[in-house]
């Protein structure tokens, strides 16, 4: 098993938002990380008194995802919107009506508990992303949004057969093209890696990218979810640094090829 990352501390939303669009003024990049930490805000700690094992597991957060997101944002000169509050409080990658928006540790009654969580943690995060995307499109730019995640190597007793997954909507040509270029570039740089399309989840599944697709045309918004196998997450290890470098360099290469197309 990889060395487990320490819990991420800090505000529930960490955002750096330069008004930058990388090297192509026609394109605006946005990087997000919905499951970057397992922090429990003080007012809700009593609810999680017996949930430490879940908080420290893949259920609590996505180990490594925030590290990758920060590096992606620096490389793209892009705004980063990232959450360090545990997904067990509220899952920022779920639509508002999703039945698993809250975990079993958040009681449904009285209703003001969940309403307060959504008001303090869910809505500000989602609005921040929505505002960044809408503002860029309003300026006539095409938005490329990369949402950084990681996945547990074994789920429900089944071994996940991939090192990296690139998730997209097959019905949106821009996402298909960029994903294909990214995957090809990554496999060329790191042929030992198994890189899969729409795995371990489908790109059309309920999530932040899927939500944004509903509100923006395919010509204006490209939403890609990056999924990295958590078995590679090993802080301080050369292999983990090399994987991150390959992911970022291959995306840069894919974007350059797209610009020339």
Which residue ranges define each predicted feature?
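N-terminal catalytic or cofactor-binding beta/alpha core of small enzyme domains
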Residues: 1-261
């Amino acid at each position: 098993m990889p060395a487990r990352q320490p819990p991420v501390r800090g505000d529930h939303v960490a955002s750096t938002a330069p008004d930058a669009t990388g090297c192509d003024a026609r394109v605006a990049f946005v990087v997000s990380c919905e499951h970057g930490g397992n922090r429990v805000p003080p007012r809700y700690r009593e609810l999680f008194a017996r949930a430490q094992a879940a908080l420290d597991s893949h259920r609590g957060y996505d180990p490594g995802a925030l590290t990758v997101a920060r590096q992606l944002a620096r490389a793209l000169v892009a705004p980063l919107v990232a959450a360090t509050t545990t997904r067990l409080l509220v899952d920022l990658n779920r639509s508002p009506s999703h039945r698993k928006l809250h975990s079993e540790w958040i009681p449904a009654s009285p209703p003001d508990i969940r309403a307060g969580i959504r008001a303090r943690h869910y809505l500000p995060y989602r609005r921040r992303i929505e505002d960044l995307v809408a503002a860029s499109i309003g300026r006539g730019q095409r938005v490329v949004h990369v949402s950084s995640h990681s996945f547990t190597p074994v789920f429900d007793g089944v071994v996940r057969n991939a090192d990296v997954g690139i998730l997209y909507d097959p019905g949106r040509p821009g996402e298909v093209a960029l994903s294909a270029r990214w995957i090809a570039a990554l496999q060329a740089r790191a042929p030992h890696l198994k890189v899969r399309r729409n795995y371990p989840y489908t790109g059309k599944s309920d999530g932040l990218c899927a939500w944004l697709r509903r509100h923006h045309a395919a010509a204006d918004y490209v939403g890609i979810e990056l999924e990295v196998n958590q078995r590679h997450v090993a802080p301080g290890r050369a292999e983990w640094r090399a994987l991150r470098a390959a992911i970022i360099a291959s995306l840069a290469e894919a974007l350059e090829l797209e610009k020339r197309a």
